[in-house]
């Protein structure tokens, strides 16, 4: 998966808008973060703690949680080595999480 694929998937989610402050893309639903580009091969995706724990167990080569995100509802996806379907599912789950805040 490439960042363009993330843009396509996230952009297809109703109400999600992309901006690129400082040259890195971020996708938000009504101002609430869905995902943010860290570099060309990684995005951080919003995820509740239960979902995060689940994807870390199921897809350890795709998702990780660096120390700086341990206390936050976020998971990092490796676009170059990760499972495309799992990343797409995580983006949709992030959108559902943010929609639930309406």
Predicted regions and their residues:
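Charge-dense, helix-prone N-terminal extensions
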Residues: 1-102
């Amino acid at each position: 998966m490439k960042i363009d694929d993330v843009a396509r998937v996230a952009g297809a989610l109703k109400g999600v808008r992309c901006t690129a402050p400082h040259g890195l893309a971020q996708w938000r639903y009504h101002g609430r973060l869905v995902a943010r580009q860290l570099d060309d091969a990684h995005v951080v995706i919003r995820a509740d703690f239960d979902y995060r724990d689940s994807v870390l167990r199921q897809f350890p080569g795709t998702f990780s949680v660096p120390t700086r995100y341990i206390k936050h509802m976020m998971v990092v996806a490796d676009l170059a080595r990760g499972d495309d379907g799992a990343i797409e599912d995580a983006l949709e789950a992030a959108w559902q999480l943010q929609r639930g805040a309406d």
